[in-house]
Amino acid sequence: MGFPRILSKNNKIYTKLGEFCLSGDSFWIVCHTCQEELQTQDAFWKHIQDEHNFLHGLAKQEHGRNSSYCLPDVDAATAPANQTALPVPLALYHCAKYSEEEQREVAAAVELHEAQQQQQQQQQQQQQQQQLQQQQQQRDSAELQAVTAAAESSARSNNSGSGIDIKVEPTSLTLTSEIQVAAAAAAAAAAAGAAAAGAVTANTTIYHLSQVVPGPPPPPPPTPCFVTTPTAGGVSTTPPHPALAGPVGAGGNGGNGANATVMQQACGTLGMPLLGVAAGQAELVAKESNSTTASASSAVSSDDGERWYICDYGACGLKFKYKSRMELHRVVHSKERRFNCDMCSASFKQSCNLSTHRKKKHSLRGIKSELLPQRF
């Protein structure tokens, strides 16, 4: 078979003991000595070095086949076994079995194969670019449709919402005649403008501003100086002291003027302590309402038939099954501290807090408060 010259991809010519085979997307080299297929030229080069000692000039004796090598030194190396085998180096470029035309054909085949691979790669790249362009076009079309739909919906809403919105206040409010006349004139002008415009859409809002006409001033208080004091049952009117009334009818008009002056001074003098008493009673009522003895709300029946007591302090709204528990809970809302410590000035809302204070601060155990809690 000889030494074929193989043209590699890097345009280097090698003389090797093998045959170059090209098929589809790959090529391989078949060793002529052992018929082993190798994928790359480097592997084939290593194979002939390690297995057949090609570069070392030693031809193995186990090669049974008569090779048609074009080297006389190889024939001498393959002599009978009784003769001494001399190490003769083998020349690489000595055989010229394959002509230059065949080498050109092999080179052309390799170039054609590389060109085909490049074309396939270019085609794949073009297909990928086309797919990307199609996807981008689809996205653009979808966005355009969405924008168009949004514009149409906004236009429809504007067309449907166009018109004149008239907001009229309730008739129970008192309006002056001038405001009513002005509002009627504005409504008539708006209606005339809308009829003249025709297809022109406009949003007009007319507000009837209501003005509360102040009523007549209250009458002045009565001349007699009567003091009003709050009582448990209601309001009582106390007449002035009889000594301050003075003589009536004897002095004529002059006497009446003097009596009026004396009455005004007496009313100013007596009004101050009476007002102080009224303020003290109001504070007492406020304290009673803030204390824990305030009247609780009545029991409320639930769906399951049970009666619950609800705390009516502010927005608390907690429910209790027993009234005593609810009264104990109301101490939380109260500002009153009924339980005072005998050892210091501390005070507490609940007796348990006082007991804890005595145990921690004064080391007193088992001593209860002498103060009796208020009965609910």
UniProtKB/Swiss-Prot annotation:
UniProt name for this protein: AT-rich binding protein
Which SMART domains does the UniProt entry name for this protein? ZnF_C2H2 (SM00355)
Gene Ontology terms: cellular component: nucleus
Q: Where is this region: Disordered?
A: 143-165, 213-250
Task: Tell me which residue ranges form C2H2-type zinc fingers.
Answer: 29-52, 309-333, 339-362
Presence of the UniProt keyword Calcium in the record:
no
* Listed GO biological process terms: regulation of transcription by RNA polymerase II
Report the function annotation for this chain.
Answer: May be a transcription factor for genes having (A+T) stretches in their promoter and/or enhancer regions. Binds to AT rich DNA.
Q: Does the keyword Thylakoid apply?
A: no
* GO molecular function terms noted in the UniProt entry: DNA-binding transcription factor activity, RNA polymerase II-specific; RNA polymerase II cis-regulatory region sequence-specific DNA binding; zinc ion binding
Please list the residue ranges that the record marks as compositionally biased, kind Low complexity. Answer: 149-163
Q: Give the UniProt keywords, A-Z.
A: DNA-binding, Metal-binding, Nucleus, Repeat, Transcription, Transcription regulation, Zinc, Zinc-finger
Q: Which organism is it from?
A: Drosophila virilis (Fruit fly)
Q: Where is the composition biased (Pro residues)?
A: 214-224
Where in the cell does this protein reside? Nucleus
Entry-linked SUPFAM superfamilies = beta-beta-alpha zinc fingers
